[in-house]
């Protein structure tokens, strides 16, 4: 494999372990010297360091199993860019060469990027999209390109948390089609030094955009639901709400709420689940009864006319505690507060 945007060598030090030989390419000579010094210390003896421009070196490459690129996300003035064509190097312009020179090309992109637009810009060559979140925040967007393998596009939504190294949430979350959760490109084996790094637990949901999914169950009403489910950051970035509802048998509160309901607990839901204790409108009398005994709460708004700060001021509640209040608007255009506690 070849990493054409080597940088500090962090990505390279992990990906290189999955290949018999690996090449680090970086035009900054100082970084090249640093990585050349660090690789033996990391126990990586299958790699070579090349100080060269990525575009120039690409033209000299023989066929590779994988080419990795993490294009610079700032323009010549230092401003952040989120459009694929504005990154350096321009992978859209380099696409024909990348496909010709490798079985797989992996792009590491800004989580702010519109991945649907990126897939479109890359002209049907994207085989996999990996959306990776850590601790509730979307951190990375990875695209895997190939002309060699013709298959439907798969989207992997991964959410990582510090903990044990188990995988929860099911290997393939989508019931819309029979999908394998295994990526089609080589995976990095465990590093010898893995024991020195924090272990992770991960929730994984896999789906195929455009697959025929059953319509989400909208019969379940907010007022008589017992459980509330909030998708994780990767699901939110993917926007796969119909697929999620079909896979787990949950009902959307409304089209734009991105909250889901169920009458029973849902095992392995990729996100947070809550038990609903009370449901109230903004009617003063109802609010007084529903909030009796509650002095502080964690408040979130989803498709709701008030901000969190405005609602907190109106409810006169402090921040924190074990009560969670979700303010949202139902499909019937009714503003409701769902007062809940974390489930398990």
Regions found by a protein language model. Name each.
Residues 1-344:
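SAM-dependent transferase fold signal centered on methyltransferase-like domains
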């Amino acid at each position: 494999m070849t990493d054409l945007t080597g940088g500090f060598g962090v990505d390279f030090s992990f990906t290189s372990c999955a290949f018999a030989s690996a090449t680090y390419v970086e035009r900054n000579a100082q970084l090249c010297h640093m990585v050349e010094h660090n690789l033996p210390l990391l126990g990586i003896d299958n790699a070579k360091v090349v100080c060269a421009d990525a575009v120039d070196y690409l033209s000299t490459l023989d066929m590779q199993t994988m080419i990795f690129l993490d294009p610079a996300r700032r323009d010549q003035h230092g401003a952040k860019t989120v459009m694929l064509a504005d990154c350096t190097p321009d992978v859209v312009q380099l696409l024909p060469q990348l496909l010709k020179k490798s079985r797989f090309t992996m792009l590491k992109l800004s989580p702010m990027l519109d991945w649907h637009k990126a897939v479109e810009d890359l002209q049907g060559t994207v085989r996999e999209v990996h959306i990776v979140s850590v601790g509730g925040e979307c951190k990375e967007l990875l695209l895997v390109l190939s002309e060699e393998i013709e298959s439907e596009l798969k989207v992997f939504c991964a959410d990582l948390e510090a903990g044990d190294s188990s995988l929860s949430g099911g290997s393939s979350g989508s019931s819309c089609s029979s999908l394998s959760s295994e990526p089609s490109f080589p995976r990095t084996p465990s590093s010898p030094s893995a024991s020195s790094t924090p272990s992770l637990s991960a929730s994984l949901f896999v789906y195929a955009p455009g697959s025929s999914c059953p319509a989400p169950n909208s019969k379940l009403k907010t007022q008589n639901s017992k459980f509330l489910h909030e998708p994780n950051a990767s699901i939110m970035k993917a926007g796969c709400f119909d697929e999620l509802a079909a896979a787990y048998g949950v009902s959307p509160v409304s089209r734009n709420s991105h909250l889901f309901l169920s009458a029973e607990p849902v095992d392995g839901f990729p996100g947070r689940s809550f038990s609903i204790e009370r449901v109230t409108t903004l009617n003063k009398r109802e609010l007084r009864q529903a909030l009796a005994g509650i002095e502080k709460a964690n408040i979130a708004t989803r498709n709701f006319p008030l901000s969190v700060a405005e609602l907190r001021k109106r409810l006169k509640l402090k921040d924190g505690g074990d009560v969670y209040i979700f303010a949202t608007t139902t499909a019937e255009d009714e503003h409701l507060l769902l007062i809940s506690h974390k489930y398990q």
